[in-house]
């Protein structure tokens, strides 16, 4: 039984019902429906902190999904899991793959910026000032792209850019 049929909370059940209705109304292939089911199950597992299960579902969704836009969200969510697990290099790979398919994904730009900023902070702790400047400059560039796509979001990033003279 797919995970999406086991959901206990109201929001997940509502989302599942609406998604199922949309899948019946909108003309989609069996492959597209299967890909979406795996994606939805991946999101559900991810929300519950079941990252291994979520990754399995996302990888299966990637195998089935052919639409680049839809694939971008799957890749983005895989990146989120790797970020949560502290696997920043792997996360960056997935965020960049997501952005290749969908360059209008501000949350991916934001997450790349957050990782760059984190690496800048690490460089400061190691007293590597030149590397920290480079990481912070990269973070600034990615945050600028995120803000350009979603001007009302990322207020903390906007403040950081102003305070550090990068905007």
UniProtKB/Swiss-Prot annotation:
Subcellular location: Plastid, Chloroplast thylakoid membrane
Alphabetical list of Gene3D superfamilies matching this protein: Tetratricopeptide repeat domain
PROSITE patterns, sorted: TPR (PS50005), TPR_REGION (PS50293)
UniProt membrane topology term: Peripheral membrane protein
Main location: plastid
Keywords for this protein: Chloroplast, Membrane, Photosynthesis, Plastid, Repeat, Thylakoid, TPR repeat
GO cellular component, one term: chloroplast thylakoid membrane
Family annotation (SMART domains): TPR (SM00028)
Family matches, as InterPro entries: PSI_Ycf3_assembly, TPR-like_helical_dom_sf, TPR_rpt, Ycf3/AcsC/BcsC/TPR_MFPF
Protein name (record): Photosystem I assembly protein Ycf3
Organism encoding this protein: Chara vulgaris
Phylogenetic lineage: Eukaryota, Viridiplantae, Streptophyta, Charophyceae, Charales
């Amino acid at each position: 039984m797919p995970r999406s049929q086991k959901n206990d909370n109201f929001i997940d059940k509502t989302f599942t019902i609406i998604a199922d209705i949309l899948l019946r109304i909108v003309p989609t292939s069996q492959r597209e429906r299967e890909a979406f089911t795996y994606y939805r199950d991946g999101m559900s597992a991810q929300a519950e902190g079941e990252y291994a299960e979520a990754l399995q579902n996302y990888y299966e969704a990637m195998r089935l999904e052919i639409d680049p836009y839809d694939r971008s969200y799957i890749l983005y969510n895989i990146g989120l899991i790797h970020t949560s697990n502290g696997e920043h290099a792997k996360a960056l790979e997935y965020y960049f793959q997501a952005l290749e398919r969908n360059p209008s994904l501000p949350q991916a730009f934001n997450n790349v910026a957050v990782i760059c900023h984190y690496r800048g902070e690490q460089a400061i702790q190691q007293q590597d000032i030149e590397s920290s400047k480079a990481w912070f400059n990269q973070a600034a560039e990615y945050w600028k792209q995120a803000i350009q796509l979603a001007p009302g979001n990322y207020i903390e990033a906007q403040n950081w850019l102003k305070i550090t003279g990068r905007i």
